[in-house]
Amino acid sequence: MAGAKEIKTKIASVKNTQKITSAMEMVAASKMRRAQERMAASRPYAESMRKVIGHVAQGSLEYKHPYLEVREAKRVGYIVVATDRGLCGGLNVNLFKKVVSDVKSWKEQGAEFEFCPIGARSVQFFKSFGGQVSAHASGLGDAPKLADLIGTVRVMLDAYNEGKLDRLYVVFNKFVNTMTQTPVIEQLLPLPKSEDDEVAHRWDYIYEPDPKALLDTLLVRYVESQVYQGVVENIASEQAARMVAMKAATDNAGTLIDDLQLVYNKARQAAITQELSEIVSGASAV
């Protein structure tokens, strides 16, 4: 059994760690609330944009935009949104597993693939995973701006426009609630048709003055908005996962302190008993 002094030092060390994890939990909780507010503010726009584009994809257009045409998938692109920092449980690992599984299914169909990782952890993973990394972004912070993403997204859009990509997906952790964050893969291009009940009441839009000029701008803006929403959702998921992970670490530290305190008490009691035995033995000898 370790000495009482050694155990006491270990208890002090665990207590210091507990203070750090507790502080990180509170910081993550505060950041999560702000991230949720940003996510809630941008979600209606992203969902409305998705709905409008879904109807556009269903409509009978005189001008057929390349983003509406479905072609054979020979090369697939992924914009993968992960975190810049760790200490957020299995958030990134679960996301990467989902991407790897999807890549495997496309690989079996003979398709090639390339990646656009967003977030330092995503960049690190896909540079070692294999496959072409066409563009990447990291260090976006807790309050990213669309302008920070446009350059990276445009690289993938240009590849699609040039026929180097036949499918484009965005992958991120969708924020469900504080305890649940789900990795999702959403198709960006070709534009997915709306699965809404409103499709039953189908209509066409009238484009003024020119459908080509409008759609060229609108569809690019749609892709950018969906990627931005994915980044915002992922930040909220990151802070929620970190808060839960740090709470678990704080609780585990408390349990470990209790266990060490018990061991310390036993060691101290054994030392006192030993001293008493020696005193009694010495007195008997006299």
UniProtKB/Swiss-Prot annotation:
InterPro entries: ATP_synth_F1_ATPase_gsu, ATP_synth_F1_gsu, ATP_synth_F1_gsu_CS. It is found in: Cell inner membrane. The gene is atpG. F-type ATPases have 2 components, CF(1) - the catalytic core - and CF(0) - the membrane proton channel. CF(1) has five subunits: alpha(3), beta(3), gamma(1), delta(1), epsilon(1). CF(0) has three main subunits: a, b and c. Its main location: membrane. It comes from Shewanella sp. (strain ANA-3). Keywords: ATP synthesis, Cell inner membrane, Cell membrane, CF(1), Hydrogen ion transport, Ion transport, Membrane, Transport. Produces ATP from ADP in the presence of a proton gradient across the membrane. The gamma chain is believed to be important in regulating ATPase activity and the flow of protons through the CF(0) complex. SUPFAM superfamilies: ATP synthase (F1-ATPase), gamma subunit (SSF52943). GO terms for cellular component: plasma membrane; proton-transporting ATP synthase complex. It is a peripheral membrane protein. It comes from the Bacteria. PROSITE patterns: ATPASE_GAMMA. Belongs to the ATPase gamma chain family. One of its GO terms (molecular function) is proton-transporting ATP synthase activity, rotational mechanism. This is ATP synthase gamma chain. One of its GO terms (biological process) is proton motive force-driven plasma membrane ATP synthesis.
